[in-house]
C-alpha cells in the first residue's frame, strides 16, 4: 500500500492515541511489524505549542519509520499553520483528527464534532492539503450519531480535497467506545472511493484483522487499544495477513526484556517524575497479558525512582520465569 510517495511495508498500522503513542511506544510497535505508526494528537492552538508536552510531541527527528503526525483543531488557518510547523520539524505525513469522541476535544469543535459541519470540514481539508507538500490523511468516525451517519459524504469531500488516505472507525461519536464496532459503513465507503481506506475499531486479534480486511475490502487496518501491552500483535497479524501463516508470540523471556527496555526508554524520554508516572499504566497493560498481579501493581505504582522501578520489574519477572521453569520440569 502507498500513501502519497511512501510505500508502506505492510497494511497494519498503529492508531494515534493521546498519552500512549509517544516515541518509545511507536518504536516498539515498528520493531514488531507495524507498517505505519501515528503520533499522539497535536493541538493546533498556538498557545500550547511551547509547553513541554508539545515540545516532546514535536521531536520527530528520532522517529523509527515514516513520521506520521496527527493534528486536531477547528480553525482552517491554525490547522494549516500547525501542519507546516510539524513538517518543518520532520513530519512526513500529516493526519487530521476528525474522529476523537472526547468531550474536552468536542467542546472546542474539534475531533468528531466536525462531522456535523461538512462545509467546515471542506475548508479545513483544503487549507491543510494546500499548505504542505507531504501527504495529508484523515481519520473520522461513521458519523455524529446513529441518525447522522455521514461518513460517505465526508469521505467524498476528503477525496475531492486531495486527502491521500482515509481511516474510518466503525462507531459514531455518540457510541464513544461502547458496544461493538460495525464495518458495513466502512465497506460502503470503500466501494465508492478510489483513495486508500483504512478500517479501524475493535481489531484485537490476527483473525479479526483478516476478517475485517476481507469483509470491507479495506486497503489497511489500524490497531488502537488492542496494542496496549501487546505490541507484538502487529507481527502476529502481519504473518497471517501477508503470509497466511501463524507466527507465535515472543517468548516470555523476550517479552520481559522488551518491557524493561520500554520502561527505561520512558524514563529517558520524559525524565524522572513523568517517566515513572507514565510507566505505571504501560506496566499494568503488559501484566494483563503476562500475569496480572494486583499486589505487585499496587507496590509498583508507589515507586517514584526509575532505578527502583526497573529493579522491581526485574525481580517480578525473575519470579515468573522461575515458576515457568519449575512447571516445565514437573511436566516432563
UniProtKB/Swiss-Prot annotation:
GO molecular function: flavin adenine dinucleotide binding; FMN binding; tRNA binding; tRNA dihydrouridine synthase activity
List of residues binding FMN: 16-18, 70, 139, 200-202, 224-225
Cofactor(s) this protein cannot do without: FMN
Recorded catalytic activity of this chain's protein: a 5,6-dihydrouridine in tRNA + NAD(+) = a uridine in tRNA + NADH + H(+); a 5,6-dihydrouridine in tRNA + NADP(+) = a uridine in tRNA + NADPH + H(+)
Disulfide feature: none
Annotated active site: 100
Matching InterPro entries: Aldolase_TIM (IPR013785), DUS-like_FMN-bd (IPR035587), DUS_fam (IPR001269), DusB (IPR032887), DusB-like (IPR004652), tRNA-dHydroUridine_Synthase_C (IPR024036), tRNA_hU_synthase_CS (IPR018517)
Enzyme Commission code: 1.3.1.-
Domain of life: Bacteria
A Pfam family this chain is assigned to: Dus
Keywords recorded for this protein, A-Z: Flavoprotein, FMN, NADP, Oxidoreductase, RNA-binding, tRNA processing, tRNA-binding
CDD domains linked: DUS_like_FMN (cd02801)
Family per similarity comment: Belongs to the Dus family. DusB subfamily.
PANTHER family: TRNA-DIHYDROURIDINE(47) SYNTHASE [NAD(P)(+)]-LIKE (PTHR45846:SF1)
Matching HAMAP family: DusB_subfam (MF_02042)
Task performed by this protein: Catalyzes the synthesis of 5,6-dihydrouridine (D), a modified base found in the D-loop of most tRNAs, via the reduction of the C5-C6 double bond in target uridines.
Name of the protein: tRNA-dihydrouridine synthase B
Organism: Pasteurella multocida (strain Pm70)
Gene name as annotated: dusB
